[in-house]
Amino acid sequence: MERGIITITENGTVTMPTVPVWMTQQEMSDAFNVFGCDIRRAVHAIYKNMELFESDTMRYIRQDNGISYDVYSLEMVITIAFRLRTKECMAFRRFV
């Protein structure tokens, strides 16, 4: 699965990949400059409130070396960015 990762520089420049965005919780926490537990909490709340559905926004992928992990769609990344309050999230919201 080819997947893109959004990057946000310190000065607020957002780089959007040309391939579909699918990011892990760790990649989102790095991009938005928050702890992983903040991302996990936001994902859990989004699913609990039925704002988005897991079947539409999460995929389970396995690397060639056998390591597997969950990745989340652009729709989830955007929803999380509107829940968190960091300068990186604000830059991403302006970009969207």
Predicted feature locations:
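Positively charged, aromatic-accented nucleic-acid-binding surfaces
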Residues: 1-34, 61-96
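Key DNA-contact positions within bacterial/archaeal DNA-binding proteins
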Residues: 37-41
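Short Lys/Arg-enriched helix C-cap and helix-to-coil transition segments
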Residues: 51-65
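Amphipathic alpha-helical interaction segments
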Residues: 35, 50-54, 84
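DNA major-groove recognition helix of helix-turn-helix
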Residues: 43, 47
